[in-house]
Design a protein with these regions (language model features):
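Beta-sheet-dominated interaction scaffolds and their linkers
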Residues: 1-37, 168-180
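Short regulatory "switch" loops immediately downstream of catalytic or recognition motifs
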Residues: 12-13, 28, 52-58, 112-117, ...
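Glycine-rich, flexible loop segments associated with nucleotide phosphate handling
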Residues: 23-33, 86-97, 124-134
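Intrinsically disordered, low-complexity acidic/polar segments
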Residues: 43-45, 58-60, 118, 144-146
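Intrinsically disordered, low-complexity Pro/Gly/Ser/Thr-rich segments with frequent PxxP/GP/PP motifs
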Residues: 57-125
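Asparagine-centered strand-capping/turn motif at beta-strand->loop junctions
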Residues: 24, 30-58
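Conserved long hydrophobic alpha-helices within structured protein cores
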Residues: 1-12, 46-55, 61-68, 102, ...
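Terminal connector regions
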Residues: 105-180
Length: 180
């Protein structure tokens, strides 16, 4: 599978482990998004593809796999949860996806912040969940899709009641190109 880019998703306190907080310490959620577009070309047919995620760290920090939210925005702009992201015996990711000419879909993975008992079980220093690895996009027909990966971060107050900031930045692709 052609590697697209590295990825990192996390939900954690910004306080390094072992440091005693003197004030409220912000909490960050970081998500990974891939916008997949198929330019409208004459006589083009829909394309199937897989967007897979190979971990380079075991996804067991914090709440682990149950804390992951996988979604995609379809061609109508509607958000859809994707329940089959972690399926035993198959690659992790969005499998058997289809896109038609002239469409754009946006895929995202993020970690939900711990709540209730899960938050109490995760110690505040570096509390939360993190997952890192390599994302790959494997279309059935090459060189027709445009893929743009981004990281998005949302910063919350320590009690997670207020958003204090956010940022979006492009993630370099392995090839340096966006045509896949």
């Amino acid at each position: 599978m052609p590697a697209l880019s590295s990825f990192e998703v996390l939900a954690e306190s910004l306080l390094p482990k072992g440091v005693t907080p003197l004030t409220n310490v912000p909490f960050v959620l970081q998500a990974y998004f891939v916008q997949v577009s198929y330019p409208n070309t004459p006589k083009a047919a829909p394309i199937q593809f897989d967007l897979t995620f190979e971990e380079t760290t075991n996804f067991n920090q914090g709440v682990g796999q149950p804390g992951l939210l996988a979604q995609f925005l379809d061609e109508k702009g509607l958000a859809n949860n994707y329940a089959g992201f972690f399926t035993a015996g198959k690659p992790n990711g969005f499998l058997a996806q289809q896109i038609a000419p002239g469409q754009t879909k946006i895929y995202s993975v993020t970690v939900l912040p711990p709540s209730g008992a899960a938050r109490a079980a995760a110690p505040i220093p570096q509390a939360g969940t993190g997952w890192r690895g390599i994302a790959s996009l494997n279309p059935k027909t090459a060189n027709l899709l445009i893929a743009t990966p981004t990281q998005r971060q949302i910063y919350f107050s320590a009690d997670m009641q207020t958003i204090t900031g956010s940022v979006v930045y492009a993630v370099p692709t392995v090839s340096g190109k966006t045509v896949i």
